[in-house]
Amino acid sequence: MDVVSSARRGPRQGDVWLVALDPTRGSAIRKTRPCLVVSPDEMNQHIATVIVVPLTTTVRAYPTRIGIHFRGKTGQAALDRIRTVDKARLVKKLGGVPEAAADEVAGVLVEMFTRG
C-alpha cells in the first residue's frame, strides 16, 4: 500500500507522521516534526486524537530515548515527550519504523507506566 492510500485510512501504530506540535508551552518539543504513533489501532480508528512520540536528532543519554533510524537520519524517539494530539495536527504520513523499533518503544512505554 502506498503512502497516499495508507494516509487516507488514518494513523496506525508504528507509523511516522509529520505533526504540527505548535503552539506549545514550557519545555514541550516544538514545531512541525516527525512523530511516531504509539496509540493502538483500535483507538486510532474510533477517537479524534492519537498518542505520539516526537522524533528528534538531538541525542540524549536518557533511558526514555530510543534510537531510531528513519529516512536516512539517525535520531531518537523521545518517549519522555509523549503527547496526545488531535488528528487535525497530522500533516502527512511519512512512513513507518521497523517492527523491532516499534517493539522496543512499546517495551519502554510499559516500563514507564508500570507502577512499582
Residue positions per predicted region:
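Conserved functional hotspots at enzyme active or ligand-binding sites that engage polyanionic ligands
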Residues: 1-116
